């Protein structure tokens, strides 16, 4: 209950469409924290951690939402995070109330996700061939 007002859901949608209603709230929030005293590529390590957590959850039927639109100062205080650590993301885990589908990213769609006629999420993404090269 303390975390909910400090995170923003579906920032491209109006709050009444993108914010979970009572009974739809996550069952768990995880704070992803980076230790800035450890040398290396924090962004890569964070991405690997996020991918593994969300894929493992999905394999068990649990949905997730990686949240970057968060009130970092307030969450840092709430969670007692101190230097050299810093809050990178919050991840919400729970059982999805809506379906999500990846749709092609085009000039017309841009990156903004939207709701279809069934109120399910359509999330524009670049194709695998646009982001990867195979040898």
Please tell me what each predicted stretch does.
Residues 1-135:
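Acidic, surface-exposed loops and disordered segments
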